[in-house]
Every structure is written in structure tokens, then in C-alpha cells.
């Protein structure tokens, strides 16, 4: 998994409806991603870089707020995030993905400018970076791998647009373009790619549908 810095400045609190979420609680919610699987307190603590006591207290609070689910396996407490509650998306996945995007942009400003053009194309619905650039293992010879979903019968038009950006930016894109309704079929047709998208993909456009496909529909 790509390592990201999850700890940010102190003093942040947000109010969502009737719930008040502290900075630490928000950081813990995002720490469940990208796997969104069960974790121990120690595993969560390693990701958020706070003391055991503070993490434990925040987890108890999140459990009371019904955002996190606590259960016991043997002598160990295990925690998981409830993917159906809106905070899992807004404070969890969104926050995690924003951090991924920011770290990518810092390293690859020119590539990001080109990706923005794909985002702004009215025919594109999802724009997802995958492959070596999303994993941080790219070389000078690496193409930029993008999945772009679009309206049916617009695949060739979108593919040609993405490839045309090479002339403007000097970047070799390797786009995979298909209609938006075909995205969920990746899970069955190419489970290795599906897992790579979940673990390493950077979603620049369409993160709400990506979250639904990968996390809610994948349960």
C-alpha cells in the first residue's frame, strides 16, 4: 500500500448534522482506507501517529456515534468502519483520496494539468489514475495509465482526446476508455486490476460512484 501522511494540524472540529467530529476522529475514519477492512487499535495507531490512549478514546467515541463498529476476537478488540454511513465517504474516503491527490500533484504538476483537461472534458464521468504512477514506481519510460468512463458510444472520441494531450504536454497517456455502466464488470473480468484500483487508484473525477462500486457494492 502507498504510505501517506495522515496526521495534520491540531484543533480541527467539524459538525455534521447533530454529530461533532474531532480532528482525530476524522483522521481515524480516513485511516480505514483504502482497504476498509477490520483493524486493531495498534494498526490504526500506526497509521494516525497518535498515542494508544487517544486513539482508544476516539474509537470509543466513534463507536458510540455508530460510525465505527467494535467487536471482540478472542482477547483482541477489532474495529471496522460502517460503509453505509455518510461520514465514511465524506470524512473517510474523500479525505484519504484528497491526500493521495495532493501528494501526486506535488510530484507531477505537468501531468496533473493534463489530467485536469480530461476531468473538464464534458464526455468524461470518471477519471482514475492507476499503474506505476499511482503506485509511485514510475520510471522515465512509464506511460500514464488512466481509466476514463464516458457515455456509451463516446469511447473513441474520449480516447482520441486523451492521446492528443501528448502534443501539448509531451506526456504518453495509455487510456482505458469504456462506458460508465461497464466499470463494475472489472471485478469479475479482471480481479487483479480491481484490487489495484482499490489499493492504489487515484480518483480525480467521479469519486462518489467509485466509492459506491468499490466499497458499498463490493461488500
How should these model regions be labeled?
Residues 125-133:
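Short helix-loop-helix/strand-helix junction enriched in hydrophobic and basic residues
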Residues 147-149:
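A contiguous pocket-lining binding segment that forms or flanks enzyme active sites
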Residues 2-123, 135-141, 151-219:
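Catalytic core of pol beta-like nucleotidyltransferases
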Amino acid at each position: 500500500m502507498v504510505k501517506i501522511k495522515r496526521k495534520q494540524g491540531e484543533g480541527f472540529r467539524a459538525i455534521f448534522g447533530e454529530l461533532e467530529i474531532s480532528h482525530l476522529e476524522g483522521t481515524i475514519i480516513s485511516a480505514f482506507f483504502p482497504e476498509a477492512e477490520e483493524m486493531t487499535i495498534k494498526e490504526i495507531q500506526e497509521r494516525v501517529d497518535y498515542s494508544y490512549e487517544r486513539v482508544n478514546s476516539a474509537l470509543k467515541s466513534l463507536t458510540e456515534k455508530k460510525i465505527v463498529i467494535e467487536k471482540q476476537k478472542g482477547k483482541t478488540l477489532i474495529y471496522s468502519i460502517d460503509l453505509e454511513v455518510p461520514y465514511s465517504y465524506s470524512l473517510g474516503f474523500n479525505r484519504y483520496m484528497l491526500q493521495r491527490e495532493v501528494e501526486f500533484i506535488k510530484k507531477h504538476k505537468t501531468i496533473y494539468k493534463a489530467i485536469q483537461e480530461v476531468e473538464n472534458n464534458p464526455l468524461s464521468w470518471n477519471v482514475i489514475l492507476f499503474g506505476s504512477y499511482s503506485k509511485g514506481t514510475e520510471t522515465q519510460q512509464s506511460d500514464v495509465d488512466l481509466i476514463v468512463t464516458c457515455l456509451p458510444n463516446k469511447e473513441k472520441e474520449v480516447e482520441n482526446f486523451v492521446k492528443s494531450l501528448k502534443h501539448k504536454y509531451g506526456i504518453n497517456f495509455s487510456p482505458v476508455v469504456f462506458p460508465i455502466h461497464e466499470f463494475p464488470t472489472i471485478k469479475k473480468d479482471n480481479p487483479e486490476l480491481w484490487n489495484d484500483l482499490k489499493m492504489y487508484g487515484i480518483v480525480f473525477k467521479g469519486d462518489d460512484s467509485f466509492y459506491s462500486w468499490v466499497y458499498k457494492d463490493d461488500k
